[in-house]
Regions:
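Helical hairpin unit composed of two closely spaced alpha helices linked by a short loop
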Residues: 221-229
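Alpha-helix boundary/capping detector
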Residues: 43, 47, 60-61, 86, ...
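Flexible, acidic/Gly-rich N-terminal and inter-domain linker regions that tether
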Residues: 1-105
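Conserved Radical SAM active-site core
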Residues: 92-212, 222-223
Length: 229
């Protein structure tokens, strides 16, 4: 299918979107509308962009796709938490969890499909690493939960499958997309990254200008035990 080779429109920068709007013969203000639909309202199709002319939406659909994940499995627990298995267009699947409580919605996302860290107690590491996720694929997990529950996400924890600091640059990009006032606008302190302890990237994370939250999974305070785990 031809659509497999088309780029995901959400990977374009605001400048690139403006260029596309201009090339398709649309007035400049359409770029702002497009930005709002893509990154503030987080739509997953061109049909949802109701204030754009139908002909323009059809033009966009000829040039771009939404490479959003498909929900393969959803488990709902008694407390309302939902666990999803989400599959990306290339067939790679990851787990995501939505945890609603009064006036709040926390989401736990994966940063890699599989993991190379080899922690003894962790099921994810048994199969090794398939691939790292892109920042957009991390954000897509958050958007999926938000749309499924019909609620705004108030916090995100990077504690699903994978080691975020083994995919550092994309993790930081995802944090900034989630934090952006032109995106999901989640406060930096409500975005938490959990690492099993990749020291150079802990330092790099601490040097970021934003006040993102760090959680370190020590497994044990005793170094010899920790080495075994």
């Amino acid at each position: 299918e031809r659509t497999h080779h088309l780029p995901d429109i959400r990977t374009l920068s605001p400048k690139e979107l403006s260029q596309v709007v201009s090339e398709l013969g649309q007035p400049a203000f359409r770029a702002k509308q497009l930005n709002e639909w893509l990154f503030e309202k987080n739509v997953c199709s061109f049909e949802e962009m109701t204030n754009l002319p139908k002909a323009f939406r059809e033009q966009l659909a000829e040039h771009f796709v939404f490479a959003v994940p498909t929900e393969v499995v959803k488990q709902v627990s008694k407390d309302g938490s939902r666990k999803y298995l989400l599959q990306f267009p290339d067939g790679v699947a990851v787990e995501t969890v939505g945890m609603p409580s009064r006036n709040r919605l926390a989401v736990c996302i994966s940063t890699q499909a599989g993991c190379n860290m080899g922690c003894a107690f962790c099921a994810t590491g048994l199969a090794g690493l398939t691939r790292s996720l892109t920042a957009q694929e991390m954000v897509d997990q958050v958007v999926h939960v938000s749309r499924d529950l019909g609620e705004r996400v108030t916090s995100v924890v990077f504690m699903g499958q994978g080691e975020p600091f083994a995919n550092f640059n994309e993790t930081v990009r995802a944090l900034r997309m989630l934090n952006s006032e032109h995106g999901l606008n989640i406060g930096a302190r409500h975005l938490t990254v959990s690492t099993c302890g990749i020291i150079p990237n802990i330092r790099a994370f601490a040097d970021l200008p934003e006040q993102f939250t760090l959680a370190v999974s020590l497994h044990s305070a005793i170094q010899s035990t920790r080495n075994q785990l």
